[in-house]
Each structure stands twice: as structure tokens, then as C-alpha cells.
């Protein structure tokens, strides 16, 4: 006699090979889906979202500069996936201060110090306006890539920042050193260079030799580090 066809409504054991294979497939898909989400889709909104793994692995983050606040820092809106994931044409970047609240990282350019602007009744340093204007022209309203190195005492993300120009990818800290609108960071703490300290110092030496920017002041130059020690710490 021919075998009796199995009842299609009969339950299948969880140990059935098909169930095991299906479960393994779903688990694998969820795992890699979550990894993909974390790396390419999840937005880093504030410094609190920066995990030790992101910093330790020198993870690059792509985003939009919403505001330049000083000669060596700016606000960064993370846009994971960039244009491919709809940023700028399908997914809009907020423009108002209200909508940007708790949605951006304050980026402190690594390895450099720009002249101090006027703050809290303190005078501005020579070339502080020029440095601020230069940085605004260079990055404000543009997309950049950052590599976070650390978070400083002011909750700023100390990072290498790079931007694409017609002549290729540019390191923003290096470009500021070239034109003399920043010097190599002097502080004993919070100095992050990645692997670029020697390069930065060579660029600074060349700008000094050519008397670019702040170096045109000669012996009258007070470095940003010295200025802060005098005016902000009462020395």
C-alpha cells in the first residue's frame, strides 16, 4: 500500500532540521542586520553616543557642519551613509537651533590651537577673526569626515577632521597650520594628534619661516596657550 501522506497541519518539532536551519538563518540575519545598523544607519547624536569602541577603533563618521563657533571648533551633524542613505535629498538636515538641540557633536580640531576670540569680557587675540572667518569659509555648511580621538573636559569631541576639495581630501588642522591661523597644541593635557604630530610640527615650522598668519607678529606673538593661562587662569 502507498504511504499515508503526512498531515500538513501537524506541528513540527523544534529540533526538526528545517526549524534549526530557519532559526539559524534568522539569528544570523538579525546579528548582521544589527551590525549594519550600528555602523551605517544609527546616528551619533551627542558625545554620550560615542562608545569606547568607536574611539578605540578610530571609526570615521561622516556628517554636516551646522555651525562654526570658534577658530578651532564646529558643530557636526552625523549623517550615516551620506547621500546614498538619502541625506540632503530624502532625509533633511535640521536648520533651526531648536531642531538641532541635542542632535550634534561639538568638534574640537585635533592637534591645533587657534587664536582666542573675545569671551567673557576678555580681549580677542590678533588673527582670531581671520581664523574664524577662514574656518567658516572652509567647512561651514559642508560635509566632513571626523575621526574621534577623545572627549575633553568641556564635552567636546577632539577629532581629526577631513574634507574633500577639488585637489583631494584635506586635513583641516593641517590646512589651518599652513596658513598660520593655528599653531600646534601646547597644552599638556587633551593633546590628540593621531599619527600626525610630526607632520603638524613641520607644517607649523614652514608657516613660521614664511611668517604666515600669526607668525607675522614675530616677537609680539602670544600663543593661544599662553593667552589662556594669562587671561583665564589669572596668571
Swiss-Prot record:
It is found in: Mitochondrion; Membrane. The keyword Nuclease applies. It holds the Pfam family SNase. Ca(2+) binds at residue 113. It is an enzyme of class 3 (hydrolase). Belongs to the LCL3 family. One of its GO terms (molecular function) is metal ion binding. Its EC number is 3.1.-.-. The active site is at residues 108, 116, 156. The chain crosses the membrane at residues 15-37. This is Probable endonuclease LCL3. PANTHER family: EBNA2 BINDING PROTEIN P100 (PTHR12302), SERINE_THREONINE-PROTEIN KINASE 31 (PTHR12302:SF3). Residues 59-217 form the TNase-like domain. GO terms for cellular component: membrane; mitochondrion. It is a single-pass membrane protein. The keyword Hydrolase applies. Keywords: Calcium, Endonuclease, Hydrolase, Membrane, Metal-binding, Mitochondrion, Nuclease, Transmembrane, Transmembrane helix.
Amino acid at each position: 500500500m502507498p504511504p499515508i501522506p503526512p498531515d500538513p497541519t501537524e506541528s513540527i518539532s523544534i529540533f526538526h532540521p528545517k526549524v534549526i536551519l530557519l532559526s539559524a538563518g534568522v539569528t544570523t540575519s538579525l546579528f548582521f542586520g544589527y551590525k549594519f545598523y550600528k555602523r551605517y544607519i544609527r546616528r551619533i547624536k551627542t558625545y554620550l553616543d560615542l562608545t569606547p569602541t568607536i574611539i578605540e577603533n578610530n571609526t570615521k563618521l561622516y556628517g554636516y557642519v551646522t555651525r562654526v563657533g570658534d577658530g578651532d571648533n564646529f558643530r557636526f551633524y552625523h549623517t550615516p551613509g551620506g547621500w546614498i542613505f538619502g541625506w540632503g535629498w530624502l532625509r533633511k538636515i535640521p536648520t533651526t537651533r531648536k531642531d538641532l538641540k541635542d542632535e550634534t557633536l561639538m568638534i574640537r580640531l585635533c592637534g591645533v590651537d587657534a587664536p582666542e576670540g573675545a569671551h567673557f569680557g576678555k580681549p580677542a587675540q590678533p588673527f582670531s577673526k581671520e581664523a574664524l572667518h577662514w574656518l567658516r569659509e572652509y567647512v561651514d555648511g559642508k560635509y566632513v569626515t571626523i575621526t574621534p580621538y577623545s572627549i575633553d573636559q568641556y564635552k567636546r569631541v577632539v577629532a581629526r577632521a577631513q574634507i574633500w576639495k577639488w585637489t583631494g581630501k584635506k586635513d583641516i588642522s593641517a590646512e589651518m597650520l599652513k596658513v598660520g591661523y593655528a599653531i600646534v597644541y601646547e597644552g599638556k593635557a587633551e593633546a590628540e594628534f593621531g599619527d600626525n604630530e610630526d607632520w603638524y610640527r613641520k607644517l607649523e615650522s614652514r608657516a613660521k619661516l614664511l611668517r604666515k598668519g600669526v607668525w607675522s607678529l614675530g616677537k609680539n606673538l602670544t600663543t593661544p596657550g599662553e593667552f589662556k593661562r594669562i587671561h583665564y587662569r589669572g596668571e
